[in-house]
Amino acid sequence: MLTAFKLNNFKSFQDEAVLPLGGALTVLIGANAAGKSNVLEALRLLSWLASGNKLGAIQREVNRADKVVRGRVPDLFRRGEHRFALGCQVQDAAGDSSLSMALELRGDDLHIVAERMDTGTGVPLYDMDQPSQGELATEAGVAYNNFLKGGNKPHIKVTDQMAVFAQLDSPASFHANHRKAQQEIPKVCKAYQALLSNVLFLDPVPARMRDFSFLADKRLGGDGANLSSVLYQLWCEGELRGELLSFIQSLPEQDITGLDFLKGPRGDVMVQLIETFSGTPRRFEAALLSDGTLRVLAIAAAMLSAPEGSLVVIEEIDNGVHPSRARHLLERIQAVAERRNLRVLLSTHNPAMLDALPDKAVPDVVFCYRDTRSGDSRLVRLGSLPDAPELFIQDSLGHLMTSGALDRFVKTHPGPEARKQQARAWLAALRTSAPGVVE
């Protein structure tokens, strides 16, 4: 599973920023224009590359409704830069591994100029050490681990218009004599492809969720348009019915006792909620449900249908969720994530949602802010802050953010090392003014 995502020189980010994903639930917070959307956009780009897409198609993606990136290709880079980097860390049964890649702008086109995958053995699984040269060139050289002694590793040719790990998923890519390379490298590359391409970026669009969807469409889309068919599959599995109803209890002023489905003539379905008041059941199909109800249903479908070990990203989770039910919803998300071995990344700027976070999720909150001097975006995990307990005892997390106390603490609070330096400086000044003072 993904344990961290990295970016450098991407849009508002300059120095390498790390988004830790070590806990079941990570919440990304920060003011408007702090850079939260840029983090998610960079992660979306890496996921898009893992699906085998070519860089030449990226500008077309800008014009799509579910676009990968916003703006023009040159807008992806930190101002004044012509290269940015993306990467991630992964943990699985085989151990820890990491992926890093750098992309460069030549003329109007993007090129991958560096890509490397490490598995902790001291020798990279592969390393693009011969990038293409020239504005029109796209052929690059990649050294790969042949698992034999000797520092000189064999090379193969790849295109710099696709992620290298999306090209090395076949044993035929390697020399016939390098049997272990033929076995190991495609296996790891396929695992990375599956893990990254299966990241679900959930940003439900209620208007698209009020129609029938085809039963064959079993993987929830980011906009939730096929919500009904995914819920149908989950409901038919039986053992997940209780989990679904528990999520739906996040809805206020409703007593939902079950789901039903309208069936169309083309193998399509539309979900119905069964609501019971005073012992009388009534059915309400998706076309009649509120935006908030549809969003909660989409979150439930995402959490229960995502492949185990995968990452689910829920953007602006507070939209349509009543504050009185926020805690229940977040507790359900965390419980299901832990049970199904998922990683969940939420973004929000709603103080009520932050105050509703389960206590054990608070250290994994990641604060995104702009540096006061350089203006670049930065990320910090609250649990990693020096003297973090000193911050948390002051007030609730939501009020700390809205009052500006969190922002001031992160930007101005001296950590232990800074305090040591201040103490040394004070002692040095004391010795200078009073020569008789000893240590």
Model-flagged regions — what are they?
Residues 78, 251, 328-439:
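C-terminal lobe/lid and adjacent interdomain/linker elements of RecA-like ASCE P-loop ATPase modules
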Residues 226, 249, 253, 257-304, ...:
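Conserved ABC ATPase signature
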Residues 21-23, 306-308, 339-341:
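Short loop/turn elements that form and flank the Walker-type P-loop nucleotide-binding site
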Residues 11, 44, 318-321, 351-352:
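Catalytic acidic motif of RecA-like/P-loop NTPases
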Residues 1-83:
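Pre-Walker A-like glycine/lysine-rich segment at the N-terminus of P-loop NTPase domains
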Residues 95-246, 250, 254:
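Electropositive, glycine-dotted interaction segments
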Residues 67-121, 201, 382-387, 391:
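P-loop NTPase motor core
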Residues 82-84, 110, 197-198, 361-364, ...:
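Short glycine-/polar-rich loops that comprise or flank the Walker A/P-loop
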